[in-house]
Amino acid sequence: MSAEILRVHPDEPQPDRIDYIVSCLRKGDVVALPTDTFYGLAVDPVNLQAVERIYQIKSRQKHKPLSLLISSLAMAYELARDSDPLIDRLADRFWPGPLTIIVRAGTKLPLRSTANTGNVALRVPDAAIPRAVVERFGLPITATSANLQGASECTHAACVRDQIGDRIPLIIDGGPTGHSMPTTIVDLSLGPGRWEILREGAIPTHEIVMVLQR
């Protein structure tokens, strides 16, 4: 069966459609939706059956953890094990935006949701649809890219439909995404004051370094 495609306004998401998306997530469905970089696959990260479905849909290796979309720095600290001034610095400068921050996970997430790493990758997207979903849901949602393992990432809903439209029940069409580059990833899980840039993406490395070394 092909996925249902639901149009949602990218800047002013219709509340009734956000409610529908949230109801699907609460049922354990996998939902493809736009972020500010690529389209992503959203599920409730506490629902381990839904998390498992994402790995099956993408043919993704089980040791690779899924990043999470959140709505605020406060939500980040609800999910992180420790407070860290470096999180504050990066969030103040780059959130909402295409920056993923890896931290040690707290007790709110099942270990399996971290791919048994004990770490969690978080970001606040600069996109109204996923932020509205997270705020209405009251929990983070997963944000792994909505494509098959090894295939190109999708910046529009038709690409998602063509790649995995027969594997998921719902695709949110919010138009093209704002970037054609992945997020920049910074690892803060290494210990107090320690950090590593794992991937340069939409935010250049030198901008990250300037913030972390000030």
Predicted feature residues:
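Active-site-adjacent structural elements in enzyme catalytic cores
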Residues: 1-214
